């Protein structure tokens, strides 16, 4: 087996391919990507058999920015007979590790998603057949590998597997979040998704705790502030625009009509700084770096708006500059970045300061 499939946002295949090429080269696992614009996935073909499995073990999924999911896979199965689609798939999975879950998926395009109704119907008979052949355990298990069947067209699919300690836990790599009817804007889902992706669920009570203070730069009308308020935090909302009255009525929000680049909290008791400003990405990244280095906040989640061209290069440059700034200032940190499902022409970055710094 020498293919890895990576799901991505349609239109970002080139960035996803460039990133996986860089990561594979660093691991000295050589191959090349195959992409088609707006298909929502990338096929990376390794020169050596077995390198696909090595890659999905050695490459931390959490450090891939543009990939929503990755799994090692067979080459594309085509022309599955309508009267028996199961047998060719069972043949393809010979030699796979025994898996604890089956996901029959499609890429995230309108064309492919038309197949989802079929995928749902096909799941039960394929799961039964796989359990009969001991390809799947008798009971679903979140500790065992995940078996992926990805249909890109009727009768055409990739069959592969991922490891649960190094994949996306979500079907199709997409968290299913419901828009809260009382939220002031749909941007609220970006921050909610970021919490799901960047912060382990068992740490939410400690790191997203009631009573904490947060700062939201470029807050109006309050989509990101809403997420902090919902978790019983207090928020400094920074913007020259108008905040949703429903948020102001909670008594948890202090509004400051000032420029987000000039605001400094009077009391340095802030845990979270969040920012979704429409600004040059390098400028936003540097501002977030300053907040953390000065210990004005302990954790940050912010969006970097991407240019029309050279998106991957811009991301690499901004993140590298930010890391170097932290290193230069002697700050220990943890940094993750992801092109989230609810992001468009932007990526979301999370940084956590790991040392006890005094505000200055």
Swiss-Prot record:
It holds the Pfam family RlmM_FDX. One of its GO terms (biological process) is rRNA processing. The active site is at residue 305. The keyword Transferase applies. InterPro entries: RlmM_FDX, RlmM_THUMP-like, RNA_MeTrfase_FtsJ_dom, rRNA_MeTrfase_M, SAM-dependent_MTases_sf. It is found in: Cytoplasm. It catalyses: cytidine(2498) in 23S rRNA + S-adenosyl-L-methionine = 2'-O-methylcytidine(2498) in 23S rRNA + S-adenosyl-L-homocysteine + H(+). S-adenosyl-L-methionine binds at residues 187, 220-223, 239, 259, 276. It is an enzyme of class 2 (transferase). Disulfide bonds: none annotated. Keywords: Cytoplasm, Methyltransferase, rRNA processing, S-adenosyl-L-methionine, Transferase. One of its GO terms (molecular function) is S-adenosylmethionine-dependent methyltransferase activity. Its main location: cytoplasm. One of its GO terms (cellular component) is cytoplasm. Its EC number is 2.1.1.186. Monomer. Belongs to the class I-like SAM-binding methyltransferase superfamily. RNA methyltransferase RlmE family. RlmM subfamily. Catalyzes the 2'-O-methylation at nucleotide C2498 in 23S rRNA. HAMAP family: 23SrRNA_methyltr_M (MF_01551). This is Ribosomal RNA large subunit methyltransferase M.
């Amino acid at each position: 087996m020498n293919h890895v499939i990576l799901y991505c946002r349609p239109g970002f295949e080139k960035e996803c391919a460039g990133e996986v090429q860089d990561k594979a080269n660093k691991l000295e696992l050589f191959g090349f990507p195959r992409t088609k614009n707006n298909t929502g996935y990338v096929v990376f073909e390794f020169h050596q058999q077995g390198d696909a499995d090595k890659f999905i073990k050695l490459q931390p999924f959490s450090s891939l920015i543009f990939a929503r999911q990755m799994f090692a896979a067979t080459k594309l199965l085509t022309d599955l007979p309508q009267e028996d689609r199961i047998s060719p798939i069972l043949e393809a999975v010979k030699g796979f590790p025994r898996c604890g879950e089956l996901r029959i998926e499609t890429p995230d395009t309108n064309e492919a998603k038309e197949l989802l109704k079929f995928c749902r119907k096909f799941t039960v008979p394929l799961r039964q057949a796989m359990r009969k052949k001991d390809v799947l355990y008798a009971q679903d298990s979140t500790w065992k590998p995940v078996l992926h069947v990805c249909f890109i067209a009727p009768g055409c699919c990739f069959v592969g597997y991922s490891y649960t300690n190094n994949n996306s836990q979500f079907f199709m790599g997409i968290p299913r979040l419901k828009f809260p009817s009382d939220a002031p804007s749909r941007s609220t889902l970006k921050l909610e998704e970021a919490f799901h992706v960047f912060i382990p669920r068992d740490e939410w009570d400690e790191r997203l705790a009631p009573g904490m203070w947060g700062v939201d730069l470029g807050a109006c009308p309050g989509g990101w502030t809403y997420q902090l308020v919902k978790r019983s935090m207090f928020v400094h909302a920074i913007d020259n625009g108008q905040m949703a009255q429903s948020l102001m009525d909670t008594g948890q929000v202090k509004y400051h009509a000032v420029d987000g680049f000039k605001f400094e909290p009077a009391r340095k008791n802030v845990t979270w700084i969040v920012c979704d400003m429409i600004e040059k990405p390098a400028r936003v990244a540097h501002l977030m770096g300053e907040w953390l280095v000065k210990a004005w906040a302990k954790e940050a989640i912010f969006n970097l708006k991407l240019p029309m061209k050279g998106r991957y290069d811009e991301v690499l440059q901004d993140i590298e500059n930010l890391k170097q700034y932290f290193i230069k200032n002697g700050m220990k940190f943890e940094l993750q970045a992801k092109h989230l499902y609810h992001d468009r022409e932007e990526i979301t970055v999370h940084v956590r300061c790991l040392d006890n710094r005094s505000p200055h």
